[in-house]
Design a protein with these regions (language model features):
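A structural connector/turn signal
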Residues: 81-83
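HotDog/MaoC-like acyl-thioester-processing domains
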Residues: 1-9, 85-142
Length: 142
């Protein structure tokens, strides 16, 4: 597992862009995903494709390698749009940004917008939005 980043999502402004290094979607990862979700369908395996939510989960995992979440964070929403099938052994690239950020009642609400491309294609195979609510850091009283 890669070391977690010291960059914390709650500290990033609207418009901040991130692009983790490319990452592989492996058959081993897909088998672990199928086991964890208890997905016994062979349809994706027979077609040589990855399940859409496996692609999204792998992409968000790569994002968490470069952007950390403070303790007490809640993942409150997820939207994904698959634009194309993803080969089971694809090299994926994620690019994203903080699309919205607001503060309310001591909490920070951040919406991350991201695109995932496969095998250096020009067009994304997946587009998504993730909403996270995090506690606002308390200023130290010195």
């Amino acid at each position: 597992m890669a070391a977690r980043s010291s960059t914390i999502l709650s500290e990033l402004p609207t418009g901040h862009e991130f692009s983790p290094p490319p990452f592989d979607l492996t058959r081993e990862y897909l088998a672990a995903y199928a086991s964890a979700t208890r997905d016994t369908s062979a349809v994706y395996n027979e077609a040589g494709l990855a399940p859409p939510l496996a692609v999204a989960a792998r992409a968000l995992g790569a994002l968490l390698d470069v952007v950390g979440l403070p303790p007490g964070s809640l993942h409150t929403g997820q939207e994904i749009e698959m634009r194309a099938g993803v080969p089971a052994s694809a090299k994926l690239t994620l690019s994203g940004r903080v699309a919205q950020r607001s503060k309310r009642a001591g909490m920070i609400i951040a919406v991350l917008q991201f695109d995932v491309t496969a095998n250096d294609a020009a067009e994304p195979v997946l587009m998504g939005r993730t909403t996270v609510i995090m506690p606002q850091e308390q200023e130290s009283q010195a």
